């Protein structure tokens, strides 16, 4: 039971207003919506707000391609986004746009406060300029090879492969993503946010419990590398807010985008006078603020955003929760395979409750990627929701309606009810800590118990005997009460089903009412509540996604591993000759405390022992590695890590996680031999 009412503001990351929502996006909105609905079910004051991220060069250029004004395009996209979210039963309390007066005022206010407090620096920089388009190139419109890990085809602000951040001028072999031209350097004056000034505050905040352990560990790496001043300026032409007192200069989209959380809430406060903006955002606020985001935008939300808030006199979020990516059938979402599925394409074929449940069943508090296996998806929904949950009511409700005037009996044996109610605090804890998968397993285990009870009692046999009518009434009433408890537990996940069940019971399902005595309560006639997932509908959805691809006339992507990891840019022989690869024997392997992905390896390279930290924990146990031969980069500069010094790198193949295989040379190779 909730002991006191909390005041909570919860957000999802703002979808970019230049295209449709897809099933990868939907993971986050479903995750956040479940958490928000759970808080409201417990009686807390919870406001779930979001907005379209509507600024930046990509939007300006996309609008030009469509022959539209940017304002017209983002209004159209906003309408489409809101319809998709509504049809997936995402219950925002407010959905707005960063291109709003509220956001302009707040962005200017925060900037001016940062400037007054000495956190904005001005300097002349040399920036990449497209000579064919006569425009400065924002970081996302320069592509090249990552200067840190050498992955090709990376954007000019951060690397999707290794997570590093850098300036566009650090890219190797940069190209304009607008024209393909090789950019030239041109001087311009820019304003910078002095992020290094907040290092001590950020270190304290990131270790305060505000972040998941994996996120905090990643931030430690960034702290070790040193924080850099952040360029918050973009030159005209640009679609966004002009910087105060700086004609022709605009706020970089990542400055005003997170402020969009505040802008959307301010818009809600203007609609609802009883709400106080300052009660949630003032420095001394006692309300709670939580951000749900994808792991690709951790840097902005865990460094820039809390520092901006602190430096301008606002409160920091209580927590930032990151999740992983969505894969489909074990691979990256693919347009050519039809697994890059838009939200609208899914809705054209399947019930949104199916996906809400499947994502919930696989979500945890960790930052693991989630695989949408379409065959498993159909099997799990059919087994859990149709076969276990709804079936519990469908095979008992008819007897209550036809034989007992639609009224439930006084249950004399409350043993099962007590078992079900005893789980409420555990299930509540799982919802609160975002361990939805554990909650779903607990609930389905209870559903198994309830179905076993009905199967053993067999009320369909009881009703054939005059002397067993009351026993049948007891069994069916008990089963329906257990069904009511189960659906109440699932109400944050399955809001549409919960509505149907509320109509069936003719009452609202509440957490405080879990233990309600239902004796004499009248139910409505039972109606079908959920249909089985048909594989032909799943296949039709995939086929439609392929057709959508064909309509765009994009070339088919490469097949196999090259589809997600293309060949890197060509290097010459001299570059390759600099890499010293050696055979190494793994003498010892052990776990690293507080590291989720690392194993510590002691490597014999023929007369010398090296210590290497390798991110292969998900694929190997230490005991499986000891004694094996492998290949290491022997002349890689040592890297100081939080856990110790790493003196090289072992080579492995695979997409990552548990799908990694270290290279194992033939037994004829000996430690120390050079790989040529």
From Swiss-Prot:
GO cellular component: cytosol
Signal peptide (from-to): none
GO molecular function: ATP binding; metal ion binding; methionine-tRNA ligase activity; tRNA binding
Cofactor descriptive note: Binds 1 zinc ion per subunit.
Binding site for ATP: 335
Record's keyword terms, sorted: Aminoacyl-tRNA synthetase, ATP-binding, Cytoplasm, Ligase, Metal-binding, Nucleotide-binding, Protein biosynthesis, RNA-binding, tRNA-binding, Zinc
Main EC class the enzyme belongs to: ligase
Database matches in Pfam families: Anticodon_3 (PF19303), tRNA-synt_1g (PF09334), tRNA_bind (PF01588)
Binding site for Zn(2+): 146, 149, 159, 162
Subunit structure: Homodimer.
Motif interval(s): 'HIGH' region: 15-25
Gene Ontology biological-process annotations: methionyl-tRNA aminoacylation
EC number: 6.1.1.10
Name of the featured protein: Methionine--tRNA ligase
